[in-house]
Every structure is written in structure tokens, then in C-alpha cells.
A protein has these predicted regions:
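The substrate-binding groove and active-site-proximal loops of carbohydrate-active enzymes
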Residues: 133-144, 165-180, 223-242, 274-286, ...
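C-terminal beta-strand-rich structural cap/linker in extracellular carbohydrate-active enzymes
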Residues: 498-522
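Solvent-exposed beta-strand/loop surfaces of large extracellular or lumenal domains
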Residues: 69-80, 484-506
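Active-site groove signature of glycoside hydrolases
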Residues: 160-167, 242-275
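Active-site-adjacent "subsite" loops/lids of carbohydrate-active enzymes
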Residues: 143, 183-188, 192, 196-254, ...
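Active-site-proximal substrate-binding groove within the catalytic cores of carbohydrate-active enzymes
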Residues: 290-493, 508-510
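Conserved structural scaffold segments of CAZyme catalytic domains across common CAZy folds
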Residues: 1-213, 396-440, 450-456, 463-470, ...
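Alpha-helix-loop-beta-strand connector modules within alpha/beta enzyme cores
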Residues: 183-195, 282-302
Length: 522
């Protein structure tokens, strides 16, 4: 604002881009094909995928495009990027206003795999912190003895991080000297052993009180928010909440924040909250508040698990895509559904961008049939989770009070953590989706990375009760290999293959009942 009076910015359109229409139709249709353009923004929330979290990119008609085929001139061929509400920001004389950022990717294909790879590559470039992929335990207690044992077990098996989970008793909002001292002592112990430690804080989906909750513009009262009730981040409580979390992290040295709910985009009609004037600026100011906090965390290398699409604002990881109630099903169903989640959740997310779940103890229900404890009695199921999660390169919330209970369990976990770490670079690389898990036949994925010695890593699962032997076609185009490939099963000797005209090979595989096989491609 170069003037002498304050300016009020009611709304803005940050991007206007006219493109060639994706669909030509004389008649108007209910769902038009959209142009093949990927639009990302840091103003994204209430979603665990780019599509569901999009709040700014809108395709609109272009009435000046009078030569289009559609009789009503309704072809959506102009991209506009704008906030859904506001910002209704006041710009003081000499001041400035920064909009959200929009990033556009023009894919060279509509092929789902190739386009997905381009999206993953874009996020690796724009949010490199999303490539961090530590192995962590979701610890269910803050009892000092339990925490110290968990630290020691992490060291013993190769885990790298502990998150004091929901239900553990952790309260980051308590900045009393006693609470700070107790948790700093635990953090110091973890750090002395080379283990990072942090914890869980609930933000959305809770009610504080009528003065601090978001106010429904239709009723003038709390309630009716996206998750029922939520505090307004511009309320006195909301402002104090972030101040308390900052003090907590600075005083304890905690390394991780698992921020449940985050800010999902709730609007607030209150005119009494100090952080916003009214409804029109409530969404913008709340988003700015949480984005500023995440950037503060990012600057201090605080790892952020956020079940929302806040990557471009600083978060490291979101959910891979699952329904929590499914972790209360019997163990065998969890394994199959978990692998489907992994397969489906890695089209637009790199393996490091999503977390999955393993209920070592009961989560929401299901009793003994749904849990792995006692661990020593369910080694097959424990191994299945470890292999498929590490094999996909996706970390899980291993939720419980411990990682092992016997030497045999310890050996199992140590073996598969070591396997993952040996092949970590290729297992964290892009996934080519070979066959989706369906419980009826082999399912498989292929990690690819032309820049590594291991150009590919093929992981095959057999969910049936009988051994399966067959020729599996393996697409190797994205490995960067053009003529020949050396393939070895496990740590066995390599075999030479000549690639066909489609850059693939036919691999004879034999996978045991309810088992798996893996191959390294060089």
C-alpha cells in the first residue's frame, strides 16, 4: 500500500490462465473433462490428497471464447486460483500483503503412473522435507520407565523415533515447570541414545468453550464445524495455544509434533476474537496462523505428522489413506487392507509422504483378534506388517508400549529393519504399480530409480493358501535400463535378461502360500 490510508482487500484472483479445452461438446455435460494441468497451492486443507485438499483452483467458463463448440459457451477452460472466502485483509499505509502461492505442473501424458510420478517429483522439489522418512514407534504411555524401555528397544532394533501417542497422557499445553522438567528429562535420555522423540497434540475436533470455539455463521453459536466443534485459531485460546506449544518445544527439546486435525478450514462468525475481525477474514487469518506455526517448526527441524495436505506449508507426512475402524478387524484382514492402502496411497504420494498403522495393542476395538500383543504369539502377522510396510517404503505408526517381548520377537524386528535400511534408497524411491492386491492372485509393486546401483526393487505377495508359480511381466522402463538387466531373487545370484521392445521382462516367479518374494534389479 503506497497510499496514506488503509486498504481493505476483500478478495483476489491470484492466477487466471486460459487453456485449450479438454473436452469439446455441443451440449453441456454434468462433469466436464478438465485440462491436463496439475495445480498445487500452499492454501490447501481438509484433505489427504491434492484433489481433496484443493481449495483454490477453479475451472470456469470463458464467455469471450465465442468460437467454442458448446452452444451455451459453458466449456470450462479458464483456470482461476482464488480463496473460497476473503481474505478481507487490511493493508496499512506502507504495508504489504502476500497471497498464497500457486504451482502449476504440465504433465506430458495422461497415463496415471507417469502423471503420478511427475506429481511426486514436484512435491519432492517443492517440499524436500517430505522425503524424510524415519522409522517410529507410537508409544502409548509417558510413564518414565516405559519411555526409557522404549528408547532402549528402539536402539536395539534400529528404530529412529518415538511419538508419544494419543492416550499416552502427554499434554504439550501444560508448560508448568514440573511437566517441562519431567519431559525434558525423557527427551534428554532419548537424545543421548540417538533417538528423536516428540508427541501428539489435538487441535481440531475439540470444544474449548463458547467464547473460543468457531462460531457458526448460520446460528451465531458454536457447533456445525467441519468436525463438529473446533476452537478458533484467532480466539484468545487459539493464540495462547500456539504460544504454549512454542514454549514447550523450546524448553523440552522435543523433535516431533503429531498435530491431529490441524486446521481444516472452519470459518468463524465471531467479532470478539482478537485474531480476526469477523466472518470474511476468519478463514484466511486462521490458515495464516497455522502456516506460520508450521514454518516455525520447519525452521527448527521439528518433524510434523499432520493428517492433512500441509506439505507446502511445512508438514512432513500425512496419512497414507485408511479408515481407522479397519484396524479393529481380524489380523489377516488388516494385512490385506493395509497392503491395498499402501498400493492406492502411493499414486500421488511418494512412499515417504504417507504413514500407515499397525495396532500392536487394541486401537478402537476388535479385542485379541485384532492386535499383535502378545507379540511373540503373532510373529507371522508382525512379520507381514513389517515386510509390506518397509517393502513399500512407507512407515507405520507401530502403536503400543514396546517393540518386542522376547528374543525371537527382537530378532524378527531387527532383521526386517536391517533389510529396509540396507535397501533404503531404492525402497524410498518411486513406485510402479504392477498389480493391485485383491486376495485372489499375486500382487506386486516395483520401486524404480535410474540414479542408483539398484535400478529396481520388485516386491511380490501371495495372499492365497497355495503356492503360485507363474511368469510375471515386469515393466522396467522407469528403471532407466534399455537393453539388459541383472535380476536376483533376494540375496541370490543374478540372472541376465534382455529387455523386450516395451522395456519389460518376463520373470518366472514362485511365491509361497501367504508369503512374499523380492527381487533386486541392476
Amino acid at each position: 500500500n503506497g497510499g496514506t490510508k488503509p486498504l481493505r482487500l476483500n478478495s483476489f484472483v491470484g492466477e487466471i490462465l486460459a487453456v485449450v479445452e479438454a473436452e469439446v461438446s455441443v451440449d453441456s455435460v454434468d462433469q466436464w473433462d478438465r485440462p491436463n494441468l496439475v495445480v498445487a497451492s500452499d492454501y490447501s486443507f481438509k484433505g489427504m490428497s491434492p484433489k481433496s485438499a484443493n481449495r483454490t483452483a477453479v475451472w470456469v467458463e470463458d464467455p469471450s471464447f465465442t468460437s467454442q463448440v458448446n452452444y451455451e459457451l459453458k466449456t470450462p477452460c479458464v483456470l482461476e486460483c482464488r480463496p473460497p472466502l476473503g481474505p478481507d485483509a487490511e493493508i496499512a499505509p506502507g504495508g504489504s500483503f502476500s497471497t498464497f502461492r500457486t504451482f502449476e505442473l504440465v504433465p506430458d501424458s495422461t497415463d496415471r503412473e507417469r502423471k503420478g510420478m511427475a506429481v511426486r517429483r514436484m512435491y519432492r522439489a517443492l517440499a524436500p522435507w517430505a522425503t524424510e522418512n524415519p522409522i517410529f514407534l507410537h508409544l502409548t504411555s509417558i510413564d518414565p520407565a516405559v519411555v526409557r524401555q522404549a528408547v532402549d528397544q528402539c536402539v536395539a532394533v534400529g528404530f529412529e523415533m518415538i511419538i508419544l501417542s494419543f492416550g499416552s497422557g502427554l499434554n504439550m499445553e501444560d508448560t508448568s515447570p514440573a511437566n517441562i522438567a519431567r519431559l525434558k528429562e525423557l527427551a534428554d535420555y532419548a537424545h543421548s541414545k540417538g533417538i528423536e522423540i516428540g508427541g501428539y497434540s489435538l487441535l481440531a475436533s475439540r470444544s474449548i468453550d463458547a467464547a473460543d470455539d468457531v462460531i457458526n455463521p448460520r446460528t451465531g453459536k458454536p457447533g456445525g464445524a467441519i468436525f463438529g466443534n473446533s476452537p478458533c485459531l484467532g480466539s484468545r485460546w487459539g493464540i495462547d495455544y500456539f504460544d504454549r506449544l512454542r514454549r514447550f518445544f523450546e524448553a523440552t527439546g522435543f523433535d516431533i509434533l503429531e498435530h491431529d486435525g490441524s486446521y481444516p478450514g472452519d470459518v468463524c462468525a465471531s467479532t470478539a476474537h482478537p485474531g480476526h475481525r469477523g466472518l470474511a477474514d476468519s478463514q484466511w487469518t486462521q490458515w495464516a496462523k497455522i502456516s506460520e506455526f508450521y514454518q516455525w517448526c520447519r525452521a527448527r527441524n521439528i518433524y510434523l505428522n499432520v493428517p492433512d495436505w500441509y506439505f507446502l506449508a511445512g508438514s512432513n507426512k500425512t496419512g497414507i489413506g485408511y479408515r481407522e475402524v479397519n484396524w479393529s478387524l481380524p489380523r489377516d484382514r488388516q494385512i490385506m487392507l493395509g497392503r491395498q492402502n499402501l498400493y492406492d496411497g502411493t499414486w500421488e504420494k511418494a512412499p515417504s509422504m504417507g504413514w500407515t498403522f499397525v495396532p500392536l495393542v487394541q486401537y478402537q476395538g476388535g479385542g485379541a483378534a485384532a492386535t499383535l500383543e502378545p507379540l511373540a504369539e503373532h510373529l507371522d502377522a508382525y512379520r507381514a506388517h513389517l515386510v509390506q510396510n518397509f517393502g513399500y517404503g512407507v512407515q507405520a505408526c507401530y502403536r503400543g508400549p514396546r517393540l518386542y517381548d522376547t528374543d525371537a520377537t527382537r530378532g524378527l524386528v531387527t532383521t526386517w529393519v536391517g533389510w529396509y535400511k540396507k535397501y533404503r534408497d531404492i525402497l524410498n524411491s518411486d513406485i510402479v504399480h504392477v498389480r493391485r492386491p485383491d486376495g485372489r492372485d499375486l500382487d506386486a509393486v516395483l520401486h524404480v530409480n535410474p540414479g542408483l546401483r539398484e535400478k529396481g526393487f520388485l516386491l511380490i505377495f501371495n495372499p492365497t493358501d497355495a503356492e503360485i508359480a507363474k511368469a510375471l511381466r515386469v515393466p522396467l522402463y522407469y528403471t532407466g535400463l534399455t537393453d539388459r538387466a541383472r535380476v536376483r531373487e533376494g540375496e541370490g545370484p543374478p540372472r541376465a535378461f534382455t529387455l523386450d521392445r516395451e522395456y519389460g521382462i518376463a520373470l518366472d516367479v514362485r511365491v509361497p502360500a501367504n508369503g512374499f518374494a523380492w527381487y533386486v534389479i541392476e
